[in-house]
UniProtKB/Swiss-Prot annotation:
Family designation: Belongs to the sterol desaturase family.
Pfam family of the protein (one): FA_hydroxylase
BP GO terms, sorted: ergosterol biosynthetic process
Induction: Expression is controlled by the transcriptional regulator srbA.
Cofactor(s) this protein requires: Fe cation
Key words of the record: Endoplasmic reticulum, Glycoprotein, Lipid biosynthesis, Lipid metabolism, Membrane, Oxidoreductase, Steroid biosynthesis, Steroid metabolism, Sterol biosynthesis, Sterol metabolism, Transmembrane, Transmembrane helix
Topology with respect to the bilayer: Multi-pass membrane protein
UniProt motif Histidine box-1: location: 161-165
Domain topic, free-text comment: The histidine box domains may contain the active site and/or be involved in metal ion binding.
Glycosylation sites: N5, N269
Protein name: Methylsterol monooxygenase erg25A
Motif residue range(s): Histidine box-3: 258-264
Function summary: Sterol-C4-methyl oxidase; part of the third module of ergosterol biosynthesis pathway that includes the late steps of the pathway. The third module or late pathway involves the ergosterol synthesis itself through consecutive reactions that mainly occur in the endoplasmic reticulum (ER) membrane.
Amino acid sequence: MDSLNSSYPQSAMATYSDLLDLAAQQQPHLSGLERLWWAHYAYWDNNIVATATGIITFLAHEIIYFSRCLPWIIADSLPSIFLKYKIQDQKPPPSAAEQWACTKYILLIHFVVELPLIVLFHPMMELCGLSFTIPFPDLRTLTAQIIIFFLLEDTYHYWLHRAMHWGPLYRSIHRIHHQYAAPFGLTAEYASPWETLLLGLGTIGPPLLLALMDCNVHLVTVLAWVTLRQFQAIDSHSGYDFPWSLRRILPFWGGADWHDDHHRYFWGNYSSSFRHWDVLMGTVAGPEAREKRRAEREKRQA
């Protein structure tokens, strides 16, 4: 990318098309996506490169979040088809008014809390040594790092989430998220500003940590990770469990049924993506798990 940076048109009149042509001429081995990536950063110039990162990241976040929520909004509007897959099928699906109220609040949180964090992400990633230049990382590196991100975030989320169910923290920070005992897709990021900030650190923290450890983390990997993390959060709040749900393929995956019990019983199942922390720490939610813990206590006391 440095060779391209030294020769792209510095004129403010340079268009994306001009820059794409330049990338194609000087670096024909680059993929189409890599050329688009370079043209985006070249267009904004190094003086305001943080703006380029902010635009990419925030637009990706908004498009991915609401696009992924859309199938669940449709499912909630068609109970005659999808009610049989609803986990809490005794409760009515959210009304259009509830969906809209939730959307307005989430947009407020996105612009007031998440957008400033996203703008600040570029200087943080440069400070930690996280790369945004071309070429992109290979698929093996990207996959391995995302798996590590999932494990680190899940650990952070478990202990923070469990702490937020302590009385004072629950009342001051976490109570808003539990407004809906039967969650739906949009509620994945329905939270107080403080909770949004604290849980957001669990998402951006692992990439920055690995970058500090000289693990060659790339912004493309971070965007892929954030995409998958959003998918996971939205799906776990969807309120639906299908025969083809991921947790039926990967038994250690949390899934909607796992997190739905957390909202239903207001206790336990604190992990975000996996089940192992709740199993190890004895915080599995639901009457069956509670009865099992009671029987184990009686056995130890006998």
